């Protein structure tokens, strides 16, 4: 009952706030964020923030992921992410990790990355900013992650074993259930056939050129964004970005463009039942497909209203299902 009252109060407050805003109004931008686009198409976002003081975070987002892979390249978006820590043009071998750890940036905790279906992100967190040389090196790393990952043959072969072991470690009942669930939810689309990490046979045997081709095809400046937030001089960082990233070329006019891979609607409910002897509990999940908002609404108030309403309806459905599950 208390939760229901809280929900009503929150919805009432949200309605009052939304009444002051029109759905077609732009979402107010943070005036402290410096936004720019380089001639090669790369975007950057910079913001000064002194909490915590003396530190900053450096990110590069690539708007490409596993769904850009060809069938023969499955797992290579994730494999490429691993290779970014095995040598770049300006920091060969393990020099990147060694330099950062000497300066308090720990591999795994502060230096990391992830790959998903649609994006790949590399990050440096908790970088000390007292020494300008450390900041410059962090920017150089972002530069190298854009276009200058080494992809040395021996390093590629060494990493095969690492990733195959990662796949073996994941391969429990929960992982197998997730793969089956994602395939069912995304049935009829390219997403149905992607699991991000790939499959053992492909990881063992892919040709080095396939990895290089994926890298050069999709790691392009128009699909990349740099985000830097922390105790930094915004003007200095912006000038360094403009200078440092200038050698990243504009993509050729005939470069392949990303496709929009849609998940088709289904006229009848899709039912997927998965059983595994290693499962320790029974789980039921209900997914409801909703049309995505058109891209032109992404930066408008209506997109926030849509997200809030989705969150509340999901929470209400969750509560009701939990109540049913607790009944004798």
Question: What residue spans do the PLM features occupy?
Answer:
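Active-site-adjacent, His/Asp/Glu-enriched structural segments that form or flank metal-binding
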Residues: 52-54, 62-176, 205, 210-223, ...
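Mature N-terminal segment immediately following signal peptide/propeptide cleavage
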Residues: 26-61
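Histidine-acidic residue clusters that define the catalytic metal-binding segment
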Residues: 21-34, 122-125, 132, 140, ...
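An aromatic/glycine/proline-enriched structural segment found at the starts
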Residues: 21, 188, 225-282
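His/Glu-based metal-binding/catalytic segments typifying zinc-dependent metallopeptidases
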Residues: 255-319
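Short acidic/His-enriched helical or mixed secondary-structure segments at domain edges of catalytic enzymes
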Residues: 162-184, 262-281, 319, 323-328
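Bacterial Sec-dependent N-terminal signal peptides
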Residues: 1-21
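Short, solvent-exposed loop/turn segments at the edges of secondary structure
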Residues: 39, 53-55, 104, 115-119, ...
């Amino acid at each position: 009952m208390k939760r229901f009252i809280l929900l009503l109060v929150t919805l009432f407050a949200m309605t009052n706030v939304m009444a002051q805003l029109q759905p077609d109004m732009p979402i107010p931008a943070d005036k402290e964020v410096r936004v720019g686009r380089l001639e090669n198409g790369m975007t950057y976002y910079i913001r000064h923030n002194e909490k915590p003081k003396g530190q900053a975070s450096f990110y590069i987002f690539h708007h490409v992921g596993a769904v850009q892979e060809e069938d023969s390249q499955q797992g290579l978006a994730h494999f490429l992410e691993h290779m970014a820590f095995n040598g770049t043009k300006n920091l060969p071998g393990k020099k990147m990790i060694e330099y950062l750890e000497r300066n308090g940036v720990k591999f795994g905790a502060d230096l990391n990355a992830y790959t998903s279906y649609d994006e790949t992100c590399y990050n440096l967190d908790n970088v000390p900013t007292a020494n300008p040389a450390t900041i410059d090196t962090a920017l150089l790393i972002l530069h190298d992650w854009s276009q200058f990952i080494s992809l040395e043959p021996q390093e590629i072969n060494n990493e095969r074993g690492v990733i195959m072991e990662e796949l073996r470690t994941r391969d429990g009942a929960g992982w197998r259930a997730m793969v089956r669930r994602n395939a069912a939810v995304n049935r009829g689309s390219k997403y149905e056939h992607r699991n991000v990490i790939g499959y053992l046979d492909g990881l063992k045997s892919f040709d080095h050129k396939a990895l290089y081709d994926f890298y050069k095809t999709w790691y392009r400046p128009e699909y990349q964004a740099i985000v830097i937030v922390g105790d930094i001089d915004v003007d200095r960082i912006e000038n360094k970005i403009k200078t440092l990233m200038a050698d990243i070329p504009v993509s050729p006019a005939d470069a392949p463009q990303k496709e929009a891979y849609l998940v088709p609607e289904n006229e009848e409910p899709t039912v997927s039942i998965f059983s595994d002897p290693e499962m320790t509990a029974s789980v039921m999940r209900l997914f409801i497909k909703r049309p995505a908002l058109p891209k032109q609404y992404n930066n408008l108030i209506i997109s926030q209203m849509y997200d809030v309403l989705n969150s509340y309806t999901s929470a209400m459905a969750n509560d009701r299902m939990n109540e049913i599950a607790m009944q004798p």
